[in-house]
UniProtKB/Swiss-Prot annotation:
Superkingdom of the organism of origin: Eukaryota
tRNA processing is among the record's keywords: yes
Assigned protein family: Belongs to the intron maturase 2 family. MatK subfamily.
Name of the protein in question: Maturase K
Length: 513
């Protein structure tokens, strides 16, 4: 406990106050582009309808508000309140997006400063490979072979927006900033008097991705902090989706309060966290909790997580959101892969003097494959094929040049191969490649009002090279001296790339579902 209190005091010394007036000054653009915070990369804000807004637009909008005397909450002049004027949907949607996303930039500044001020964080850039999404799978392969049971956890959304604000109060002591945050959240919840809480959350998630991502990560970190803080030494992975928000200031205070309010429940369940064979992995709203214990222990874990979230975090977790499975008898979907731990049987021939023996050996193997049906469904939603996987043309791209069309299709194919390079079965990837290649040919044929055969003959090897993936280049060098080697389904080698820090747009819907 003394160690935790010392840790808490250390975190308090790093706490930063918000510079609230910065949101309403034109210097926010330069401040958000500070090299010490974000490096040399420009800050991009993704709005709804796949529109991109940079912080430069935030700067221009704030200047325009000064010039035209715009006010966020005008009482005397309600006609000038274009942010809350629901009759003008364009102003209401556009201004709320720009201001809320700009506010999200300012909201992230104290957390970025706290991360940079930590002495031990200076060593992290040397281990940037651990931030890769693919670094999770070698960890699972190393640990899951020795485990028995797996729990799938779906982290629920908060019941009310006020819970999000209260969670941030542990780190944010600037009252005006919290009031401004409440204004944005109430704006979405009061858009329609008949709208439900879940629809309000969906609207916030769709139109203000940066602000929602920050709030949701803060919310999820509260859900998992008690578990991750005590079990942090069991894994060296730093998930970028929640790594910034793992530390809490009032952890020791909340643990003391929890021990006073529920002393018996707290003491009985605390020893579960010290199990060295308990492993936890999360990305976005889905988490995996695996252990070597018995089924009874896993059921106790499930009961504990439900009660812990209800009494300690003030929100209700439905028991069906936590599913228990045995690792060897089930598969699980995580990060766009379908993973399983099957038991393979091998016959080993042993010889002792003149006698031969056949020994049946059973061995576990961590297997990852690319799910065919969900990926084809994702291509179907993107209008590259039908629901059954038949390639179709992309009419919206017919206005582009031929090389732009080839480049887009080839880039999508390479991204899919790059992300799913860890799949042990390549048949699904080559099926996706066939769909994209034929869809590209049909798009070009539709543009020039010709046939697919004509374009395939005219482009020849150039058309095939655009879809020649990096993985095939690697294997062609490895097996250059092999005469009977074929790419299509003849190898099961898996490659994990440690430079993947984000998920492809075609794969991301598989993770959210």
């Amino acid at each position: 406990m003394e160690k935790l209190e010392g840790y808490s005091e250390k975190q308090k010394s790093r706490q930063q106050y918000f510079v609230y007036p910065l949101l309403f000054q034109e210097y926010i653009y330069a401040f958000a582009h500070d090299y010490g915070l974000k490096g040399s990369e420009p800050v991009e804000i993704f709005g709804c309808n796949n529109k991109k807004f940079s912080s430069l637009l935030v700067k221009r909008l704030i200047i325009r508000m000064y010039q035209q005397n715009f006010r966020i909450n005008s009482v005397n002049h309600p006609n000038q309140d274009r942010l809350l004027d629901h009759s003008n949907h364009f102003y209401s949607e556009f201004y709320s997006q720009i201001l809320s996303e700009g506010f999200a930039i300012v909201l992230e500044i104290p957390f970025s400063l706290g991360e940079l001020s930590c002495p031990e964080e200076k060593e992290i850039p040397k281990f940037q490979n651990l931030q890769s999404i693919h670094s999770i799978f070698p960890f699972l392969e190393d640990k899951f072979l020795h485990l028995h049971y797996l729990s799938h956890i779906e982290i629920p959304y908060p019941i009310h927006f006020e819970i999000l604000v209260q969670l941030l109060e542990y780190r944010i002591q600037d009252v005006p900033s919290l009031h401004l945050l409440r204004f944005f959240l109430n704006y979405y919840s009061n858009w329609n008097s008949l709208i439900t809480s879940m629809k309000s959350i969906f609207l916030l998630k769709k139109e203000n991705k940066r602000l929602f991502r920050f709030l949701y990560n803060s919310y999820v970190s509260e859900y998992e902090f008690f578990l991750l803080f005590l079990r942090k030494q069991s894994s060296c992975l730093r998930l970028i989706s929640s790594g910034t928000f793992l530390e809490r200031i009032h952890f020791s205070m909340k643990m003391e309060h929890f021990g006073v309010m529920y002393p018996g429940f707290f003491r009985k369940t605390l020893w579960f966290f010290m199990d060295p064979l308990m492993h936890y992995v999360r990305y976005q709203g889905k988490a995996i909790l695996a252990s070597k214990g018995t089924l009874l222990l896993k059921k106790k874990w499930k009961s504990y997580l439900v009660n812990f979230s209800q009494y300690f975090l003030s929100f209700w977790t439905q028991p069906q959101r936590i599913r228990l499975n045995q690792l060897t008898n089930s598969c699980f979907d995580f990060l766009g892969y379908r993973s399983s731990v099957p038991i393979n049987t091998f016959l080993v021939r042993n010889q002792m003097l003149e006698n031969f023996f056949l020994i049946d050996t059973r061995m576990k193997k961590f297997d990852t494959t690319a799910p065919a049906t969900p990926l084809i469904g994702s291509l179907s939603k993107a209008q590259f094929c039908t629901g059954l996987g038949h390639p179709i043309s992309k009419p919206i791209w017919t206005d582009l040049s031929d090389w732009d069309i080839l480049d887009r299709f080839g880039r999508i194919c390479r991204n899919l191969f790059h992300y799913h390079s860890g799949s042990s079965k390549k048949q699904t990837l080559y099926q996706l490649k066939y769909i994209l290649r034929l869809s590209c040919a049909r798009t070009l044929a539709r543009k020039h009002k010709s046939t697919v055969r004509t374009f395939m003959q005219r482009l020849g090897s150039v058309f095939l090279e655009e879809f020649f993936t990096e993985e095939e280049q690697v294997f062609s060098l490895m097996f250059a001296k092999t005469t009977h080697f074929s790419f299509h389904g003849s190898h099961s080698e898996r490659i994990w790339y440690l430079d993947i820090i984000r998920i492809d747009d075609l794969v991301n819907p598989l993770i959210l579902n």
